[in-house]
């Protein structure tokens, strides 16, 4: 049984992985404008690797969230986290160097609020 401190730490770690996962794509957007002195994941390792790292961070986020919420069987949160993961995963997997600024400004930015939206929807429906 997880104690409060461990739950809190895992929850913070989970959020960090989610935030990292959805911010790396902005480095992909900025690759045309970044100077070579700035070492970002897309500049150093390439766009493909950056996308894989971002998606891996999202997988880690989902694993931690499911682990934390299966113990208390918070079904609406598990479903919401899964939907947030799927939504963010899809948006990031569709990234390329030619996406418009609107793609980043709307679709990618909406990943950050998607968990709240899915939580509200699942709370109403379940």
Which positions does each model-derived feature cover?
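Helix-coil boundary and interhelical linker segments in multi-pass alpha-helical membrane proteins
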Residues: 1-13, 63-77, 120-126
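Generic hydrophobic alpha-helical membrane-segment signal
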Residues: 2-3, 11, 15-18, 34, ...
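Structural motif marking the loop-to-transmembrane transition
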Residues: 5-13, 49-52, 74-79, 99, ...
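Lipid-exposed faces of alpha-helical membrane segments in multi-pass integral membrane proteins
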Residues: 13, 17, 53-63, 82-86, ...
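Solvent-exposed interhelical
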Residues: 16-58
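Juxtamembrane membrane-interface segments at transmembrane alpha-helix termini
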Residues: 23-29, 90-98, 117-124
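Interhelical loop and helix-boundary elements at the membrane-water interface
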Residues: 38-40, 44-51, 91-117
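Transmembrane helix-loop-helix
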Residues: 56-101
